Amino acid sequence: MAIQQPEQFYGTGRRKSAVARVFLRPGEGKIIVNGKEFQTYFRGLLRAVHALQAFRETGTAGRYDAVITVNGGGPTGQADAIKLGIARALLKVNPDFRAQMKPKGLLTRDPREVERKKYGLKKARRAPQFSKR
């Protein structure tokens, strides 16, 4: 008896305050983000095209349908969260994809977060104007 492959693969991606939950199913390459078509959700955002980079690097573009739920953050953070989520889900499809994705940085979670505002300052680092006299 052959081992049954799961029909759905899951990956989570995070960037800044955005969290993306990605579900991949074998299909014809349809990508749905929060119930909308990918192009409609990210209309005109050039950075969003990079979210699909993992599909291009592994040669799986058009082979999987993706259902993505993303919340928090802005468009750029959400696009990068989706990018990481797709890459992690593709690793579950085939662990050999790691060799193609790792050198491109697709499996690295970007650790940069917003620095907190400190008391006595106007912003995180911006100090009030200084006057000698």
Curated annotation (Swiss-Prot):
NCBIfam families: PRK00132.1. Residues 119-133 have a biased composition (Basic residues). GO terms for molecular function: RNA binding; structural constituent of ribosome. It comes from Deinococcus deserti (strain DSM 17065 / CIP 109153 / LMG 22923 / VCD115). Pfam families: Ribosomal_S9 (PF00380). Residues 102-133 are annotated as: Disordered. Belongs to the universal ribosomal protein uS9 family. Keywords: Ribonucleoprotein, Ribosomal protein. GO terms for cellular component: cytosolic small ribosomal subunit. PANTHER family: RIBOSOMAL PROTEIN S9 (PTHR21569), SMALL RIBOSOMAL SUBUNIT PROTEIN US9M (PTHR21569:SF1). This is Small ribosomal subunit protein uS9. SUPFAM superfamilies: Ribosomal protein S5 domain 2-like (SSF54211). One of its GO terms (biological process) is translation. InterPro entries: Ribosomal_Su5_D2-typ_SF, Ribosomal_uS9, Ribosomal_uS9_bac/plastid, Ribosomal_uS9_CS, Ribsml_uS5_D2-typ_fold_subgr.
